[in-house]
Regions:
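Catalytic domains of carbohydrate-active enzymes, especially glycoside hydrolases
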Residues: 1-11, 112-117
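Conserved, mostly hydrophobic/aromatic
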Residues: 1, 44, 102, 109, ...
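Active-site-adjacent "subsite" loops/lids of carbohydrate-active enzymes
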Residues: 35-42, 52-112, 200-203
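Active-site and adjacent substrate-binding regions of carbohydrate-active enzymes
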Residues: 103-118, 126, 143, 160
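Aromatic-lined carbohydrate-recognition surfaces of secreted/lumenal glycan-active proteins
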Residues: 45-62, 119-126, 150-201
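Alpha-helix N-cap and loop-to-helix initiation/capping positions
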Residues: 28-32, 93-97, 101, 147-158, ...
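Aromatic- and acidic-residue-enriched segments that line the glycan-binding/catalytic groove
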Residues: 11-25, 59-86, 123-144, 189-196
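Aromatic-lined substrate-binding rim segments of carbohydrate-active enzymes
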Residues: 7-56, 141-170
Length: 205
């Protein structure tokens, strides 16, 4: 069972880093009276099933959602590692501290819960962002002679590698997986051109 433990800067477990999602109670940060992730893990294991924590990696939601999270939003706590783009907020894949922030979240889950795996969704750049995605400053600092597209692909790979190594250092038996776009690159045999992992969202994993 893949259980969504993190949505967009809010969570479905007792966290010291990000607030409880309002989905369960109607109020951001309100404890629902039980720990949803702990419940899922326990019930899965009773039935001989694995339980994996599904984590939405980079999207943080729109302005209204981010505002609703208040002071516990990462946009408020660590604005340097976030980017606003098309009325949405994202963790900035090009900032070195982003992978450390994500590792804190993952460590909290892996150390405190008997999960069998951690799964990352939306570990990608917004679709067809091109030069409109405002990461020019980071590219100037950290690009090191690479093209913008290559740098972005490397950023995502570096994040995933860092998280994988961190999980395996804590609990080698915990599985690490991700949800890349299903089509790696365009091919001449198919009519669906332009929507792919490699160019459209800079995934090379």
């Amino acid at each position: 069972v893949l259980f969504q433990a993190r949505t967009r800067g809010d969570v479905f477990y007792r966290s010291k880093i990000e607030p409880f999602s309002a989905i369960l109670t109607g109020s951001v940060g309100k404890d629902p009276g039980y720990d949803p992730l702990a419940f899922v893990v326990e019930e899965c294991h009773k039935r001989g099933m694995e339980s994996h924590a599904w984590i939405v990696a980079l999207p943080l939601g729109g302005r209204k959602h981010v505002t609703s999270l208040g002071a516990r939003s990462v946009v408020k706590k660590q604005p340097a590692i976030t980017i606003s783009y098309k009325r949405e907020y994202f963790l900035d894949p090009g900032h070195p501290d982003t992978k450390e922030y994500m590792m804190k979240l993952v460590r909290e889950v892996v150390e405190n819960y008997d999960v069998d795996g951690v799964h990352f969704d939306y570990l990608r750049y917004p679709e067809h962002a091109g030069t409109r995605f405002p990461d020019t400053r980071g590219f100037r600092i950290y690009g090191k002679g690479r093209s913008l597209a290559a740098w972005r692909r490397d950023n995502l790979t570096d994040i995933l590698r860092h998280l994988y190594k961190g999980v395996k250092a804590m609990k080698p038996w915990v599985k690490v997986s991700t949800s890349p776009v299903g089509k790696y690159d365009d091919t001449s045999r198919y009519s669906s051109q332009g929507w792919n992992a490699y160019d459209a969202v800079h995934q090379d994993v």
